[in-house]
């Protein structure tokens, strides 16, 4: 949201979640169609591995684009286009797949925290920690970007380097969580606004740790509610996230008026 200067921006804008979804779709839906399901490598890779490979490909693309494209709007458009292309390929695979394969992919796409094993957690935690450390190292750059890229540049900030680090951090965090837990929406969009409301501060030295804490508590509450009523966690995050988004839109409209 700070980089794009857009209160309705979220981590999925970069197409990372779409990359993970495409990787999983190719594993569940595409491998049987193409006759690849018998390969031992694909069988051992699993849903998480295929999702992470899809994420890694998009991560590489984001890093290259952010270094080459000067205008931040260009990066945003490229991310959205990646999402549309991935979505189109997934729809084609869904159309050609069997009911059993569709069910498996649909269950993954609903998102869940309950299917992560201890072994997977051992892989997930180090990658997430790396992403968090990169984001913490970008705190000064993010504070400068609050006043716009031109101001940050006059203060001696390397825009390309900082932007690349921020995107890599976002891609690592979003892509890893999506690969392991499925695409859980609205948390990345709503939680930063809830954090700003609670702490009443725009300083990223407070916002980033605050967002970690608020996101942790919010996601845990959503998961508890989802388990109690036997619902997909995505439904609960959407029900709680939509009012926050509507509040942000209403607040911005009042500012404009």
Predicted segments, located by residue:
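Alpha-helical transmembrane segments in inner-membrane proteins
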Residues: 1-257
């Amino acid at each position: 949201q700070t980089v794009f200067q857009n209160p309705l921006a979220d981590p999925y804008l970069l197409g990372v979640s779409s990359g993970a979804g495409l990787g999983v779709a190719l594993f569940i839906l595409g491998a049987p169609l193409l006759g690849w399901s018998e390969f031992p490598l694909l069988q051992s890779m699993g849903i998480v591995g295929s999702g992470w490979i899809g994420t890694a490909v998009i991560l590489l693309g984001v890093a290259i684009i952010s270094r080459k494209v000067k205008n931040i709007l260009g990066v945003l458009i490229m991310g959205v286009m990646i999402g549309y292309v991935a979505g189109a390929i997934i729809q084609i695979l869904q159309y050609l797949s069997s009911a059993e394969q569709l069910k498996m992919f649909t269950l993954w796409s609903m998102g869940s925290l309950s299917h992560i094993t201890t072994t997977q957690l051992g892989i997930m935690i180090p990658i997430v920690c790396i992403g968090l450390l990169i984001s913490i190292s970008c705190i000064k750059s993010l504070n400068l970007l609050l006043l716009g890229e031109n101001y940050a540049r006059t203060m001696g900030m390397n825009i390309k380097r900082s932007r690349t680090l921020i995107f890599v951090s976002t891609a690592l965090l979003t892509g890893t969580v999506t690969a392991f837990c499925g695409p859980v929406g609205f948390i990345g969009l709503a939680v930063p606004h809830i954090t700003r409301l609670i702490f009443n501060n725009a300083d990223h030295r407070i916002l980033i740790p605050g967002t970690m804490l608020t996101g942790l508590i919010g996601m845990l509450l959503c998961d508890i509610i989802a388990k109690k009523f036997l619902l997909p966690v995505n439904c609960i995050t959407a029900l709680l996230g939509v009012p926050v988004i509507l509040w942000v839109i209403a607040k911005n409209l009042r500012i404009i008026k």
